[in-house]
A protein has these predicted regions:
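Glycine-rich, basic loop-to-helix element that forms the pyrophosphate-binding segment
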Residues: 85-104
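A conserved acidic beta->alpha catalytic loop
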Residues: 60-69, 87, 117-118
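Short beta-strand-to-loop acidic/aromatic patch adjacent to the donor-nucleotide binding site
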Residues: 107-116
Length: 328
């Protein structure tokens, strides 16, 4: 991963993803934000996106009263709809609830967001312009265009794209992160909705793989920058090197381990796709042993996830406290 510092002034006016657009298209875009115990911090995500889209749907997964109070304030606006779940239904189920509402209201595009993400100014314009640019090139089967996520914890672009990579043109990818993904509504008619068996983690990868198999294509727009906080990362020293350890919690590791196996079994992925997944989870487990104070509990839950994956047990883990869960 290349260490790249994001600066808004790097973006040039003449790139393919920054051309002027008729603002009327915004009325056809519905943004979806999934929340869980975010409290007043929801305003960072909401304020960054509310003027870039026609409507915002917020799905809350059983948050505390402080978060619900903030959501009730936002719901006073005619351009905001809230869906309040009594418990944590997982990110896949929450996305599906909002997508079904938005499709019922006739929205043409769905923009999915995590509550700890912030859209940079003009991000949605750049995503839509990417669609327009690709259509002008004769590419009509664009299903998803994703933003370029910048991790505010590590100060790295998560996918390693330079802002000007590809001359500012949209780049084709196998998958993109769910937060910051602009999805054509008609895609759901062909491939169905987000996979609720996964509950959390790899929901975006599974969706994008099904998008590709449904005859659509997935792109990323490097200049559409999304500010994101990926977990609770801590910079640690290991001999002469430095590494980042993400304190996800034991329940998160259950889902990560289980869903990694699920992805490899379900999608029959090529070695070039599975190798990075296996390599990443192996490295992460080494970091658990080195840095996590609850290492044995975390490893036990990870083992439970592995066992459940091979037994075919999916969906939510019973009586799980999902406070630390985030989709990745």
């Amino acid at each position: 991963v290349r260490q790249l510092v994001w600066r808004e002034d790097v973006l040039s006016e003449g790139s393919p993803c920054t051309e002027a657009l008729d603002s009327s298209y915004r009325a056809r875009i519905c943004a979806v934000i999934v929340t869980y115990n975010i409290r007043e911090a929801i305003h960072r995500c909401f304020d960054s996106i509310q003027n870039q889209v026609g409507h915002v749907v917020i799905v809350d997964n059983g948050s505390d009263e402080f978060t619900r109070r903030e959501l009730n304030r936002l719901a006073a606006s005619d351009s905001v709809t809230t869906i309040l779940n009594e418990r944590n239904e997982g990110i896949a189920r929450a996305f599906n609830q909002a997508v079904q509402w938005a499709r019922g209201e006739g929205f043409q595009w769905i923009l999915t967001l995590d509550h700890d993400s912030e859209a940079t100014p003009g991000m949605v314009d750049k995503l839509v312009q990417a669609y327009v640019t690709l259509q002008r090139q004769g590419i009509q089967n664009v299903g998803v265009v994703g933003a370029n996520p910048f991790d505010q914890n590590t100060q790295l672009f998560i996918r390693g794209y330079h802002l000007r990579e590809g001359g500012g043109m949209p780049l084709e990818e196998g998958d993109v992160m769910s937060s910051g993904s602009l999805i054509q509504s008609r895609v759901f008619d062909v491939i169905g909705f987000f996979n609720e068996d996964l509950f959390v983690y790899y929901v975006d990868v599974d969706f994008c793989l099904r998008v590709g198999r449904g005859g659509f294509r997935v792109f990323v727009c490097p200049e559409a920058v999304l500010l994101h906080k990926e977990g609770s990362k801590e910079r640690r020293k290991f001999f002469w090197r430095h590494a980042y350890y993400d304190h996800r919690g034991k329940h998160a590791w259950y889902y990560l381990t289980r869903n990694t196996i699920y992805m490899m079994k379900k999608h029959d992925l090529s070695p070039s796709y599975t190798y990075p997944m296996v390599r990443r989870i192996c490295k992460d487990h080494v970091k658990i042993l080195l840095y996590d104070k609850e290492r044995f509990s975390v490893l036990w839950f990870s083992l439970k996830g592995l066992i459940d994956a091979f037994r075919g047990r999916f969906g939510p883990l019973n009586s799980v406290n999902t406070t630390t869960l985030r989709d990745g």
